[in-house]
Structure formats: C-alpha cells, structure tokens
Amino acid sequence: MKAFSVTCLGFAVFSSSICVNINILQQIGYIKQQVRQLSYYSQSSSSYIVVKLLPNIQPTDNSCEFKSVTQYNKTLSNLLLPIAENINNIASPSPGSRRHKRFAGIAIGIAALGVATAAQVTAAVSLVQAQTNARAIAAMKNSIQATNRAIFEVKEGTQQLAIAVQAIQDHINTIMNTQLNNMSCQILDNQLATYLGLYLTELTTVFQPQLINPALSPISIQALRSLLGSMTPAVVQATLSTSISAAEILSAGLMEGQIVSVLLDEMQMIVKINIPTIVTQSNALVIDFYSISSFINNQESIIQLPDRILEIGNEQWSYPAKNCKLTRHHIFCQYNEAERLSLESKLCLAGNISACVFSPIAGSYMRRFVALDGTIVANCRSLTCLCKSPSYPIYQPDHHAVTTIDLTTCQTLSLDGLDFSIVSLSNITYAENLTISLSQTINTQPIDISTELSKVNASLQNAVKYIKESNHQLQSVSVNSKIGAIIVAALVLSILSIIISLLFCCWAYIATKEIRRINFKTNHINTISSSVDDLIRY
C-alpha cells in the first residue's frame, strides 16, 4: 500500500485541489527543508526602557570599599559622555545659532547631524520628539536610582512611562548580596570587578556606533539584549503583546532601540524602543525547498521550481521573501511578496511528474546530496556513494532520479570522501519508477542557451539554404511550364488548323460534287429541251 506525504493546510473540498506532495518531490531531488508561519509586521508604537548601568550594593558589616565600582563608574562616564553631548547637540541647539532647521515646530541641530540622509534626519526628529517623555522619566530618576530591583515599572500616576532595567543587578542580588558578610572585601571586590568588567566590555561593543552619532546609528535589539542581560525576555514580554516567543522576535530584529537621553550623574540611560504590530496569517505556510541534481534520461539534471513557496489551503505561490525577516519558525514580512505559479508548476508540486520541467547541468560543483532528518538523499549516479558499515557500493538504478539512504541501508556513508553517520529511518515507504519524457528537459544556463541558439541559428541557415534551392527549382519549373504551355498552345492551334482544313476540304469536295450534279442535271435538261425543239420543227 502506498503512503503519500502531502502538505495541505485546508481540507480539500474539490477533487481538483492541489497540495504539495513531499514524498514524490523528494524522489526527483526537490527536498523540503523548512516550514515557517507567515506573519506581517509594521512599526506602530514606541516604548521606553530606563537602563540603570550602575548596580546598587547593600552595605556590609565590615564597610567594604569597592574600588572596582569607582573605576567602573569612571570608565563608564568616559564611554557615555560623547553620547550625552551628541544627544544634547541634536536636541538642544544653541539659542544664538541659526544653523538649525524646524520640522513641525521641532528644532534640530543640523551641525550635529553632519551629512545625513532623509532616514537619518527622520531618526533625529524622533530623538527630539522623545525628549518630552525622556524628561518625564528623568524626573523620577531618584526612585529608579534607589531601587535594587532588576526590573520594575516607572509610573506617573496610573500611566506607565517606562520599564526600568538593571541588567547586572539581578546577578548582584542573587549572588553578590548573599555573600557580602561571608567573604573578605578583597575577594568581593575582585569578584565584582570581574562582573563589571565583562558587562563593560559588552557595553563598549554595543555602543561603539553610537559614539559617532546616536541619531544616525540606532541600536538593534540584539545589541540591546547585551545591554539588558538576563532581563531581555521580561522586557520584551512587557513591551510587546504577542503569542510569538521573545527569542523569535529578537532574532528577527523587529525591535530597534534609540538612545534618547543619558543621565551621567545617575548612570541611567533612556532608550526608546520601536514596537512592531505583528499579525499572523492563518493557514499560511512558507515552505523552503532544497534542490539537488537528479539522474534524468541518462544525464544529470535539476528540477525547475522555486526555492520557496507559499501555501494557503490548497493554493501555492512562489514566495521570494527578499524583504522579509526569517527565524526558525516564523517569517515576518511587511507586505505579501507572493508570485503566481504556472499550472504545470502546481501540478508538479502535487506530484504529477509528467508536468515537471528539468534543466541539464554540467560541472563538478553541483549540489548532489542533502541531509534530511538523519538520512541522506543523494544523486549516486553523479557522485560516489560508498557504504562503510557494512562495506559495499550503493548503486542507483536508471529509473531512480535520486537515492534515499537511511539506517536500514547503511550506518556509515561516504560521499566522495566525506563520511556521514546515518541515524534515522526514512519515512518514505515506497519508491516509484520514474518515467520522464525528453520534452521535459530544457536548457536554462546561459552557456547552454547560447549553444542551443547556435544550433538553432545553424538550422535556420540550413533552412534558408534549402528555401533558396527550392525557390530556384520552382523558378525552373515555372520557366519550363511557360515553354510547355506555348508548345501545347501551338499544338492545339495546329490541330485546330488541320481540323479546319479538313473540314474545308470536305466542304469543298461536297460543294464540288453538288455543283457537278447540278451541272449534269442542267445539261440533261438542255438536251431534252433541244430534242423537244427538234421534234417541234419536224
């Protein structure tokens, strides 16, 4: 009994519905690689995060003086001072200076921007617009500074202004504060210096672009993740309401941050986060395929299908996703990039091999195998497939386009010198004998196309030559036909002349004979008349 593996999101209501047949496609070198859920996103709102860069340390019984904190504070001030000055230059141009421009009533320091594109000027406008919220958040800096909580909400009345985060505070609370009275000051200082040094290294890496110009270089959420430390998932969940995991959103880079204010005295940084709106399209899957060469009609070929398709229910489209962000389980796009597929391509995806189109290939660097869920799918007619455990060569019959090698076939496989351990069984319970016509193979490579064009041009030249020869023959036949027509006409005229002559002769003969008869009768009458005259005289 044959078991088909078909992906189709919706229920097939009509018998003509088309779904992707994974098993059949795998047998011709078109292997499913990844399936992702399609979602759309747009930047719609903003949130603010207050990052407290200097942790609070509880006082100890022996009144330790931590020199590492003082040195860390000094180094951090040197790091953040250029950023703070740059933000102040952009957000607060000097009153006497006329070198600034207004966007909707907002004054921007053009000199601080330098050479800026439209997008960079827009970022500067956003930075200036955020100053109102930044000042409201900074007004509550004392409450933020006093707390030793790793994360908490900054509220003004009932309105949430921001989320305060102390990335290293969580480690201080859970490890350092519990050991303050059990270790010597030197050991605690060294341990704290290690944590602060590592965190400072991350900050230097994160904010290196912002040292030039924070308005022109927004920080990505990946860099912000280093800034937030272990509090990143909690911050993401607090700022973004979605069922998609924080790891997926962060890895896609959908959230970007921009430093809008730096409070050097308190070592606090206010970061504006652009929060996307994410909508997941139901019943929409984006399937990635990996094509390897196959043995078709005694030559190495590759199937002509897109590397990525979109399937909604029983309909398929090509989906390039050039402007989308991909994660392991999701694909985030700002708009639909679907492109129509021909009916033949859809039939091929459904497992109708007679509708598939292949292209012949040549060369030694073609993709000829792929690992699939612990098994290997390979074109063993174009590369050497040797099983080492047990030891025997793997032969691919002529009627098989590729070979699927699983644990029942081989345990250790060598492909052109590369060794692989097979750890799984194949889920394909059957293999069809493929029959593919020669008309299904076309050339798509530029070199092959030019070769085929040369053949076509040669055929056209031969055709032109034959046409000229045929025209010459036709012209000869035409001249001979004219001469023949003249001869025939002459013969006809001659025959007509002879017939007319014969008729004239016959008529003359008859007329002469009639005249003689009439003359004879006339003479006879004259003789009788003279005889009568003689009798009368007597």
Swiss-Prot record:
UniProt keyword Cell cycle, yes or no: no
Keyword Oxidoreductase: no
Cysteines joined through disulfide linkages: 324-333, 348-356, 380-385, 387-410
Signal peptide: 1-19
Location relative to the cell: Virion membrane; Host cell membrane
Pfam families noted in UniProt: Fusion_gly
Gene Ontology CC entries for this record: host cell plasma membrane; membrane; viral envelope; virion membrane
Record topology, Cytoplasmic segments: 508-538
Topological region Extracellular: 20-486
Database matches in InterPro entries: Fusion_F0_Paramyxovir
Subunit structure: Homotrimer; disulfide-linked F1-F2. Interacts with host LAMP1; LAMP2 and LAMP3; these interactions promote the cleavage of the viral fusion protein F.
Domain notes: The 2 coiled coil regions form a stable six-helix bundle.
Protein name from the UniProt record: Fusion glycoprotein F0
Source organism (scientific name): Mumps virus (strain RW)
Species classification: Viruses, Riboviria, Orthornavirae, Negarnaviricota, Haploviricotina
Gene behind this protein: F
